[in-house]
Amino acid sequence: MKAINIALDGPAAAGKSTIAKRVASELSMIYVDTGAMYRALTYKYLKLNKTEDFAKLVDQTTLDLTYKADKGQCVILDNEDVTDFLRNNDVTQHVSYVASKEPVRLFAVKKQKELAAEKGIVMDGRDIGTVVLPDADLKVYMIASVEERAERRYKDNQLRGIESNFEDLKRDIEARDQYDMNREISPLRKADDAVTLDTTGKTIEEVTDEILAMVSQIK
């Protein structure tokens, strides 16, 4: 098969990262978690007491992705591995706000485009098919019900030892959907040539197989 790029987009907790990792593994491609980049910048924003000078924040930031056999993708922020801090509730609650800022978006998108230049990439996020990889060979827009997405996030938090309330998670996800879809810069939307894939009620294996079937149709 020729080298291709795959873009997976969709709202929070639609299963993008889980599926992207699985698809990349099955196809021996490289997985890039763009959300982790925005989470890392949000983590720094919080450490800087919620600075509003986002241009200065990114100008004084180094951000790299590395890969370890035991951990997968690791996020190196200013020479520190911050991977284990990126899923805490404080980061989750602020990431949409930080990601909506133009300097942050431009900084992250530039890095994402550089990573995808050689092809062989599976990338997931909110604007991959529309902004980062508009020429991706396959674009999938993943959706799921709010209830199922909240349940996934709740179980994920349990596994990570993070306390959370199911109803609060539902409200947070609904609010984040509205914020992501209505922001001025790179809003969440389906690319015109993307395939919609509803993951509600489906297993990881079922969704992975559906995407692999799509890949097999690429000439």
Swiss-Prot record:
CDD domains: CMPK (cd02020)
Species of the source: Staphylococcus aureus (strain bovine RF122 / ET3-1)
GO cellular component entries: cytosol
Gene that specifies this protein: cmk
Taxonomic lineage of the native organism: Bacteria, Bacillati, Bacillota, Bacilli, Bacillales
Swiss-Prot/TrEMBL keywords: ATP-binding, Cytoplasm, Kinase, Nucleotide-binding, Transferase
Keyword match Transport: no
Broad enzyme group: transferase
Binding site for ATP: G10, P11, A12, A13, A14, G15, K16, S17, T18
Transmembrane stretches, start-end: none
GO molecular function, one term: ATP binding
Protein name in the entry: Cytidylate kinase
GO biological process: nucleobase-containing small molecule interconversion; pyrimidine nucleotide metabolic process
InterPro entries associated with the record: Cytidylate_kin, Cytidylate_kinase_dom, P-loop_NTPase
Top-level division of the source organism's lineage: Bacteria
